[in-house]
């Protein structure tokens, strides 16, 4: 037992962990003097920036402790007895689950939050010592094995994928043997359980939201439960909130979905610091100083999704370099939002408040007088309201605020 645990990297916390997780590519401000092609190529370094958040720390801690719990089950009498029971499964005989335990949890969050990157960063730190090897008896253990849930939720497909990924690390041939022997799904469960017990510490199944729409979703979750009981390993499933309604259908499914859940980032100090760090990586000829107004604009036009913020700043600079303006400002940011993020407009709607009503209501605009009382209807466009304001010599912003939610940002 101690031989296995001692080969695991020491758990990191505080500033040591933040320093290990953070990634800031090198940047020299003289790059802004280079030609356009050189700057456009260097601009992609923005995508390599990683600043750990509270989510990153929590995910690392959860994965490390789950791996530790799994490794603690790999020695002792119960582990030897479970190996014998798994052999019975392969031989299609009656068997018992010896290890068992509720060692599964979920990590769910909207796309673009950086949860997959946080998981990869955590795995990178946890597996710094590589494969764990023991001499008596000799065995090799993969600390973390990551697979993807098949789009059709095929139980056999996922079992074969686990074998294939294990072969890549162990240089074994479990996958080829399974194909040659044309083993059944039940036999595969016994085979994978035996391999997981002997060679896998933590199994991570990504894209688990596929179970919500696949007809084999419940069968796949049942297989993972059986794998936990027969191998004693910890299993982490990762996906979007689309999987939540599926796991809420029954208590036996809900028990398997306990874990970490994340939403869009809050408008707080971390978001401010994140935006300021990104603005340090400027590749346009002219430098732009970030303001509170720009940070607020970025939050509203990204919905608090980190990947969207990065895309906006990257594409804004790309547009500025290509069109020759050579300056990142609200004009280029707006152009990036309108032209490059079109598919996201249905999910990100800044400064718009939706109010449901069954009929069009007339709203009177106060603040100026005219020969005929002026009325503005909810279906009027912004352009028509501004045109009418110019004609009546009235305050356009004041008129718009009567109809829409308008926020004035000082830059």
Roles of regions detected by a PLM:
Residues 120-124, 310:
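The feature captures the helix immediately C-terminal to the Walker
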Residues 1-103:
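Walker A/P-loop-proximal flanking segment of P-loop NTPase domains
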Residues 125-137, 168-169:
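Post-Walker A helix-loop "phosphate-sensing" segment adjacent to the P-loop in P-loop NTPases
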Residues 72, 76-90, 96-100, 154-161, ...:
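Mid-core helix/loop region of P-loop NTP-binding domains shared across ATPases and GTPases
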Residues 2-31, 36, 43-46, 50, ...:
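C-terminal alpha-helical "lid" subdomain
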Residues 192-197, 202, 212-213, 222-293:
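The catalytic "switch" region of P-loop NTPases
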Residues 131-150:
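Conserved catalytic segments around the Walker B and adjacent sensor/switch elements
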Residues 95-120:
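Walker A/P-loop nucleotide-binding motif
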């Amino acid at each position: 037992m101690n031989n296995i645990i001692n080969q695991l990297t020491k758990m990191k916390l505080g500033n040591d962990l933040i320093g290990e997780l953070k990634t800031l590519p090198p940047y020299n401000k003289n790059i802004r003097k280079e030609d356009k092609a050189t700057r456009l190529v260097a601009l992609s370094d923005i995508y390599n920036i990683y600043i750990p958040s509270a989510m990153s720390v929590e995910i690392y801690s959860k994965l490390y402790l789950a791996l530790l719990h799994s490794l603690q089950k790999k020695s002792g009498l119960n582990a030897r007895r479970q190996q014998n029971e798994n052999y019975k499964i392969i031989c299609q005989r009656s068997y018992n689950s010896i290890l068992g335990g509720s060692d599964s949890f979920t990590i769910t969050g909207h796309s673009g939050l950086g949860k997959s990157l946080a998981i990869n960063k955590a795995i990178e730190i946890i597996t710094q010592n590589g494969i764990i090897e023991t001499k008596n008896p000799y065995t090799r253990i993969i600390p973390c094995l990551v697979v993807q849930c098949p789009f059709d939720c095929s139980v056999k497909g996922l079992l074969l994928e686990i074998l294939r990924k294990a072969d890549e690390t162990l240089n074994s041939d479990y996958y080829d043997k399974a194909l040659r022997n044309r083993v059944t799904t039940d036999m595969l469960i016994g085979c994978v359980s035996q391999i997981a017990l002997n060679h896998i510490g933590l199994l991570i199944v990504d894209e688990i939201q596929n179970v919500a729409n696949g007809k084999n979703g419940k069968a796949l979750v049942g297989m993972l439960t059986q794998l936990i009981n027969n191998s004693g390993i910890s299993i982490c499933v990762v996906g979007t909130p689309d999987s939540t309604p599926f796991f809420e259908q029954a208590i036996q499914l809900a028990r398997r979905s306990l874990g970490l859940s994340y939403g869009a980032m809050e408008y707080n100090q971390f978001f401010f610091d994140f935006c300021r760090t990104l603005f340090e990586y400027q590749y346009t000829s002219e430098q732009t100083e970030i303001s509170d107004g720009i940070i607020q604009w970025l939050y509203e036009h990204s919905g608090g999704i980190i990947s969207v913020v990065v895309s906006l700043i990257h594409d804004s600079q790309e547009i500025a370099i290509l069109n020759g303006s050579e300056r990142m400002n609200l004009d280029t940011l707006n152009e990036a939002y309108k032209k490059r993020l079109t598919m996201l407009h249905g999910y990100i709607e800044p400064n718009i408040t939706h109010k449901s009503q069954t009929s069009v209501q007339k709203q009177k605009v106060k603040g100026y007088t005219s020969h005929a009382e002026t009325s503005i209807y909810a279906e009027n466009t912004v352009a028509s309201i501004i045109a009418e304001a110019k004609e009546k010599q009235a305050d356009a912003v004041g008129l718009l605020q009567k109809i829409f939610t308008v926020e004035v940002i000082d830059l």
